């Protein structure tokens, strides 16, 4: 499948018609990360950030973003998502980096890759927003699709 599906015969943007696609369970896992300094790391793990629980707020922001993906990505279908999970893992072997995993699931006619990517991205952006007073030099990314399952194109694993 090397054809772009979001364009009509005139080369204009369109939202793909999925009404003929079969309903199936679809899952997507996206990942992102943010590199922070030691002060931010210590604030987060000790719950000492002045704006509150950084990871708790970021987790809720990521869930909200995944739920609202069709409002910010023009050709995404509004979906009834059956589950969203966002988890965090620290790597302090070479600095301070938070790895973000966003898993999204639905039963429907189109996939949830964009919802997972949007959720992971918004989570990282929220961590940045809540800690930028300490250091604006944080680095976000890479952000990428790790896995998807369901649908006619089958599974994808990075």
Swiss-Prot record:
| Active-site residues annotated for this sequence | 129
Keyword list, A-Z: Lyase, Molybdenum cofactor biosynthesis
Q: Where does substrate bind?
A: 75-77, 114-115
**Swiss-Prot/TrEMBL GO biological process terms:** Mo-molybdopterin cofactor biosynthetic process
Gene3D superfamilies per UniProt: Molybdopterin cofactor biosynthesis C (MoaC) domain
Q: Which molecular function GO terms apply here?
A: cyclic pyranopterin monophosphate synthase activity
What HAMAP family would the database entry show?
A: MoaC_B
Assembly state and interactors?
Homohexamer; trimer of dimers.
The record's comment on protein family reads: Belongs to the MoaC family.
* Task of the protein: Catalyzes the conversion of (8S)-3',8-cyclo-7,8-dihydroguanosine 5'-triphosphate to cyclic pyranopterin monophosphate (cPMP).
Q: What is the protein's name according to its record?
A: Cyclic pyranopterin monophosphate synthase
- State the taxonomy lineage: Bacteria, Bacillati, Bacillota, Bacilli, Bacillales
